[in-house]
Amino acid sequence: MSFNHKTIEELHDLLVAKEISATELTQKTLEDIKSREEAVGSFITVSEEAALKQAAAIDAKGIDADNLMSGIPLAVKDNISTKGTLTTAASKMLYNYEPIFDATSVANAYAKDMIVIGKTNMDEFAMGGSTETSYFKKTKNAWDHTKVPGGSSGGSATAVASGQVRLSLGSDTGGSIRQPAAFNGVVGLKPTYGTVSRYGLIAFGSSLDQIGPFAPTVKENAQLLNVIASSDVKDATSAPVRIADYTSKIGRDIKGMKIALPKEYLGEGIDPEIKETVLAAAKQFEALGATVEEVSLPHSKYGVAVYYIIASSEASSNLQRFDGIRYGFRADDAKNLDEIYVNTRSQGFGDEVKRRIMLGTFSLSSGYYDAYFKKAGQVRTLIIEDFDKVFADYDLILGPTTPTVAFGLDTLNHDPVAMYLADLLTIPVNLAGLPGISIPAGFVDGLPVGLQLIGPKYAEETIYQAAAAFETVTDYHKQQPIIFGGDK
């Protein structure tokens, strides 16, 4: 018997009633991972021994009836530090790295007696939109194994979509939670910048990165955010704001809610069928009592250019620490210190990571800083101001998560610009530090379409309220791929 169709609340009730034990649930989850892993390749590391040991300890002390997450398995993206467990960021550079500490988000999960079942595949150092830049393997879409799962958190999304786990953690720098959530038909949230501590997250773009949850439903996503969100003295960018319960507005109606639909989000480059899906969703929100009106975000069209200057510049700085001296990969053909640095970085980083380091180094270099990095920061401010103007009059922004459905494996990984444009609709949210969610909203050619809801800072409760209301009048979140036992 598999438990992967049961919600977290249903699993909790079974655990409290002692109809199953944490050990049995963990064993079944491990079986689900193993039976599907060859098809989708979601995991870099499966922590079987450690997970079963933790489950046995939870069983020994007993399930806490007041702790919803007690005994629940969790998959964690492989750029989030886990003490004593490989944390590779899907890079040769960190192929043997075992942290001596847990990321705060992982520590928060352990504090709630969650069981870390394994580490999921991703684009190397979270740089990519297809999980094809991983040093270890290419993850495949849960709905069509010839398509990409999205990225960079492709393994975390596919693990949930394929029924390997119920919950997972990812990170989002320019869409890396929302895009794979859309491609795999699950719920993925990028919280407000600073809501979840970045301590223990292997840094890519420090002003953009944010850890967030994946789940099959809106409520379960909010329940996981309740666990991982916290203020943290170990993270200087951690926000002091802490919502008591992110599920508090789920179930409320949305009558009177004002939702903005930017005309730029349905313009050039957006698949016509995705546009139709979003417009149909807008009608659903109106039927639920919300007002949906067209607005403009005029500077959003510059988002991709701004993002790749800022993110690459921050990456070139953050990745300077990987030099073969203290930990990780070291080239064995070096004859002096200079060759250790050069050979280690040349051999340890993949092509996409090296491309971004070079772009970032150029943008920060003397003579080009003002023309590129400084200018990008100025345009970023204009993008933020556009959002501020809209949120002065509206509660949420609605639009597609991605311009297309999942594309084929090995189709865009040799065309960096085309790959970058796949994040066209998610990037502005990171630049502004806003919360955004992707929820299942339909299908095009048998592949899931994601609907994105964006809110002002710390409006996760309102986002969840609207997203959950949409779930009540649609069944897209209930449809599952064949690998999960569905009929698609």
From Swiss-Prot:
Heterotrimer of A, B and C subunits. This is Glutamyl-tRNA(Gln) amidotransferase subunit A. Belongs to the amidase family. GatA subfamily. It catalyses: L-glutamyl-tRNA(Gln) + L-glutamine + ATP + H2O = L-glutaminyl-tRNA(Gln) + L-glutamate + ADP + phosphate + H(+). The active site is at K77 (charge relay system), S152 (charge relay system), S176 (acyl-ester intermediate). The lineage of its organism: Bacteria, Bacillati, Bacillota, Bacilli, Lactobacillales. Allows the formation of correctly charged Gln-tRNA(Gln) through the transamidation of misacylated Glu-tRNA(Gln) in organisms which lack glutaminyl-tRNA synthetase. The reaction takes place in the presence of glutamine and ATP through an activated gamma-phospho-Glu-tRNA(Gln). GO terms for cellular component: glutamyl-tRNA(Gln) amidotransferase complex. It comes from Streptococcus pyogenes serotype M2 (strain MGAS10270). Pfam families: Amidase. One of its GO terms (biological process) is translation. It is an enzyme of class 6 (ligase). Keywords: ATP-binding, Ligase, Nucleotide-binding, Protein biosynthesis. The gene is gatA. GO terms for molecular function: ATP binding; glutaminyl-tRNA synthase (glutamine-hydrolyzing) activity. Its EC number is 6.3.5.7.
